[in-house]
Structures are given as C-alpha cells and as structure tokens.
Amino acid sequence: MEAYKREFIEFLQGAGVLKFGDFTAKSGRKIPYFVNAGMIKTGDQITKMGEFYAKAYFDKLGKKQAVLYGPAYKGISLSISAAVALSKNGLNVPFFFNRKEVKDHGEGGTFVGYVPQAGEEIVIIEDVITAGTAIRESMEILKHLDGTKVIATFIMVDRKEKGQTEKGAMQEIEEQFGFPVYSVVDVYDIIEYLEEDPANEENVTRIKNYLAVNGAK
C-alpha cells in the first residue's frame, strides 16, 4: 500500500471520520462502516484533510485553474481547506458553496463565496459517494450556473458500490455527467489496511459480505 494511503486511513480513524458498526447511508442502505467528514473538529484536522485533497488534485489535475464547490454542509469546510492547501502549494483557486435555504435578504442568492462565470470550470469537493445521490443533487443546483462546466469531483473514499444499476456509483456519475470522480482511497485499500491486524477480522468479514451484495459489478 502506498504510504499516503496508509497515512490517510490512519488519519480518518484517528479523527473518528471512519467508523465500523451498523449505519444507514443517505441512499438508505444499511452499511457496515461509515465515513463522516462532520467528525473533523479541529484546525489541525481540517488542515490535514485539505492537504490530502490538494495532493489528489495535483496528482489528477496538475496546476489546472478551477473553482472549488463544496456542497452544504460537510463540503463547505472540505472545499475551503482544499483551497487553502492548494494556495500554500502555489495554486490560488476560488471556492464557493450553496445555502440549504435560499436567502431573500442582504446579498441574497443560492451561493456563498465566488460565483463562477460563463466559461469557468468547477471541481466538486465531497466526502464520499455511496449511490451517487449527493452528486446528483449538486448537479441539479449547479445547472443554474449558465456556461459553467463541472470537470471533476474529488472524494475521500470510493465505497466501490453499485449505484442505481449494477454499475459502480462513480461509473454511473461519470457516464451520466461526463466528468471523472477521483478518491484518495477506496474500500479495498481500507480492507487491505485492516487485514494487517487480526483483531480487525470481524470488520473485514462484514465489509466483504456487504460488498458481495452491494459492490459494483
């Protein structure tokens, strides 16, 4: 396993972002592990998270100029931390996020931060994709930005699950919207990491059994 993947998984566990047990995903699926960016609670943690996103960005997009979009609520801090980390490494990109409730006073509007203009490209910063529900919601919001184009989505963990069909949720998103989805790690990296310690046998078995039913074909 690559060193940065191991470091990232250890970071997720240490911060309480990656947990094992019985959970319900946004898609309604009962899942044996949960990735919750809402557990990031300190300056050090969000700084570190931003660095992992920035590494993924540079690895996949290089120095490409784009606007970062963080879907409310968890994507807000993720997109800001990614923008800060990119800036520290020589790439200054704008960011914005949506309001859950549209504001009808003050400056008003659906978005907070930089609002992309026609011809500009957008990168979505999300935490995780299970069935692709959240990304589809984001695309419904972003379609009102005439002349802009989403070119990629970055997530923490690819769960490698089927979406609305037997295909992987990420593959479905890529085919439906025409942009790639990149992850720092995927569930098989997590399994490989867990298998190094026999104490994790139960969690490994539960995840493998879950993937046998819900994994992408």
Over which residues does each language-model region extend?
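PRPP-associated nucleotide enzymes
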Residues: 1-125, 130-217
